[in-house]
A protein has these predicted regions:
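Secondary-structure transition motif
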Residues: 1-122
Length: 122
């Protein structure tokens, strides 16, 4: 992944809208500064909603972030994008708990992002 592709998104504390940019995480809080903002314009975000950009895109060119939900075209499967510490990679974790390397799945399947676990909670 290129250095300029390292970015995060999270939900703002003030209005629950998504904000993207650079992350500053402290012991009990997190802040994001948008790439278009001044250096002193940090936005307080909910630390539990912080998602890192994977550096990958779906079949429609939508950027894939950690905790995004994806659908496999031609299959009745959905998965969540997660970071795996043991694999040091982003994984697609199916509802049936099987997991696959995300960069591999994108090469062999047509996948489409349809939301994320924070906006599509059951």
């Amino acid at each position: 992944m290129k250095l300029e592709n390292i970015k995060f998104k999270a939900k703002r504390l003030d209005n629950r809208e998504w904000v993207e940019g650079d992350l500053m995480k402290e012991s009990y809080s997190a802040r994001i500064i948008e790439h278009t903002s001044k250096a002193d314009n940090w936005i307080a975000v909910d630390p539990s909603t912080v998602c890192q950009f994977t550096g990958l895109k779906d079949c429609e060119g939508k950027e894939l972030f950690e905790h995004d939900l994806i659908h496999f075209a031609g299959y009745n499967n959905t998965a969540e994008v997660i970071w795996s510490v043991s694999n040091c990679a982003f994984m697609a974790v199916h509802e049936n708990k099987h997991s696959y390397l995300l960069h591999y799945v994108i090469k062999i399947c047509k996948i489409e992002k349809f939301g994320n676990k924070f906006d599509n909670e059951k």
